[in-house]
C-alpha cells in the first residue's frame, strides 16, 4: 500500500505542518496572531496553559486551533469532518507547529 501524497504545499521553514482530518487536508502554522486568537478564545492565562490545552484531547481547543491556525485548506470542511480518532493527529500537529518557535534556541541548562 502506497502512502497518499499530501495535496497542499507545506512550507516547513515557516513552521507550517500538514494535517489530515478525515479525508480533508489542511496546513496549520502557529503564527503569533493565530496563537493569540486561540488563547483569547480559550481564555488561557499563559503559554503553558495554551500548550497543555492544545496537546490534550479537548474538543473546544482542537476546534479553535483548526479554525484559527489553518493557513491553507478548507478549515470548515476539516471541522465538519473532525472525529475523536483525529484528535491525536491534531495534538501532534499542534505540538510540531508550536515547536517551530523554539527550534534553534539555546537550551537553558
Region locations from a protein language model:
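Short, surface-exposed, charged amphipathic helix/loop patches that serve as local interaction elements
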Residues: 2-14, 32-109
Amino acid at each position: 500500500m502506497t502512502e497518499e501524497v499530501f495535496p497542499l504545499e507545506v512550507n516547513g521553514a515557516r513552521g507550517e505542518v500538514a494535517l489530515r482530518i478525515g479525508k480533508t487536508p489542511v496546513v496549520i502554522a502557529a503564527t503569533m496572531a493565530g496563537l493569540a486568537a486561540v488563547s483569547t478564545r480559550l481564555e488561557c492565562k499563559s503559554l503553558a496553559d495554551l500548550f497543555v490545552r492544545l496537546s490534550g484531547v479537548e474538543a473546544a481547543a482542537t476546534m479553535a486551533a483548526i479554525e484559527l491556525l489553518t493557513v491553507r485548506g478548507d478549515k470548515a470542511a476539516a471541522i465538519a469532518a473532525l472525529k475523536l480518532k483525529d484528535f491525536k493527529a491534531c495534538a501532534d500537529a499542534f505540538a510540531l507547529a508550536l515547536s517551530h518557535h523554539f527550534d534553534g534556541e539555546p537550551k537553558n541548562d
